[in-house]
């Protein structure tokens, strides 16, 4: 049987020289959602350098193997890829890119109740309404 991941709080994290292939991933599996996660007060320094075409990729489902970021290939989001999840909050998350990255900041798939608050990209406020 599949376990659950819920009621998670991660805060006050700094990430440097992040491999932009994988960005950040919150991914459950079909029928087993990750729920009630809050990520706050985070700074992520990415390498960047990916294209708009990379943003069109759909990572494979890999529910039979241990979850490692490489198993999905290049992720279609430059910030967070959120799949099979519910009630996720990103608050005061700040992204910095060494090189331009053409992918969207956030990509969601089978995800609901996702909240973005106080998000910046290279020091500029990110409009989450779009």
At which residue positions do the language-model features occur?
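Extracellular/periplasmic carbohydrate-active domains that bind, remodel
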Residues: 1-130
